[in-house]
């Protein structure tokens, strides 16, 4: 009985990990990028990012300016997800490409 319970838990964790990675790959109008440079201009944060899916050293470079308070996770070298709502508003969130499993 214990083996069946352990097997069920391990299987559900594995499936949850796979579904999380699947959803991260298909996130709509966005892309993954690596932060190359960050600078505050008043209350706006200007980020220079490379659209490289956080995997390659090459890719197009984009400068993004957002109104954002200080966030210690948006540092140079961090992998971020940039979402665009097609109206000029962009949302930046950190993304960890390493799977915890």
From Swiss-Prot:
The keyword Membrane applies. It comes from the Bacteria. The keyword Lipoprotein applies. PROSITE patterns: PROKAR_LIPOPROTEIN (PS51257). Coiled coil: none annotated. It is a lipid-anchor. Its main location: membrane. Keywords: Cell membrane, Lipoprotein, Membrane, Palmitate, Signal. One of its GO terms (cellular component) is plasma membrane. Residues 1-17 form the signal peptide. A lipid is attached at residue 18 (N-palmitoyl cysteine). It is found in: Cell membrane. A lipid is attached at residue 18 (S-diacylglycerol cysteine). This is Uncharacterized lipoprotein PM0553.
């Amino acid at each position: 009985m214990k083996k069946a319970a352990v097997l069920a838990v391990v299987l559900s964790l594995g499936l949850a990990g796979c579904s999380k990675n699947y959803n991260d790959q298909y996130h709509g109008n966005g892309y993954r990028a690596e932060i190359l440079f960050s600078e505050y201009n008043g209350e706006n944060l200007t980020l220079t990012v490379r659209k490289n899916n956080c995997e390659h050293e090459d890719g197009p470079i984009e400068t993004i300016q957002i109104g954002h308070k200080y966030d210690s996770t948006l540092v140079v070298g961090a992998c971020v997800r940039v979402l665009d709502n097609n109206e000029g508003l962009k949302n930046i969130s950190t993304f960890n490409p390493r799977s915890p499993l």
